[in-house]
């Protein structure tokens, strides 16, 4: 039995259990011979970000990361707690899920401060050290475009593991310099000393072309793997700064047949995952 957390309208989180076999999708027609799409490769790559995390709060931002977190929970990371973000009424009624408990919304911040969370955020800009911008494009005093705002990015990046999902890998996103830093990268965390660097961990960056990380001596962004059908040259051309590129770059692992069955037959029957990469 796997557990997920569902946000309620009155700022509570109710815990729901997902029952059933983790290995087979319900009503799936997927066979071992079905080739995975690029979106499905990305779902699995996002799922891998939470491997080994144990009982932490998984907070995916975006459809593909959400599918990845749910896939991880159904397979190799059953201890994950998921914030589904569904608005459901507190009044009695049939919801189709089993409420096993609840957690006050205020306790989410306790979990954040304790490092019991791993968020996968988006990014309008990311530089080579992982400094992230989701606030504005251009000079902050007179920006060309106003975006989400800083939001919880600073607290996320100094308190618990953070990964990023970028559905369209381009030099505009992977920029030489972030116009405004919201989530701090490795260079800024180091400059802050112990308060900034103690719990700072940027796990992976998953894009429509590749998986990247910061496993270098100076924590500069590194190409970890390229997705099937993509080339190293494609990733380099789509990045606005020099990447650390190993001599041998592996191919991102494709979904196993059981994972494809879950994605197609249980988690995303409408096939919305492909639209996020379009």
Give the predicted meaning of each segment.
Residues 23-30, 273-278:
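N-terminal leader/transition segments
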Residues 10-11:
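Cationic, low-complexity basic patches in intrinsically disordered or flexible, solvent-exposed regions
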Residues 25-101:
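N-terminal active-site beta-alpha-beta segment that forms phosphate/nucleotide-binding
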Residues 6-7, 17, 25, 93-250, ...:
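Conserved phosphate- and dinucleotide-binding cores of soluble alpha/beta proteins
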Residues 247-278:
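A conserved C-terminal secondary-structure "cap"
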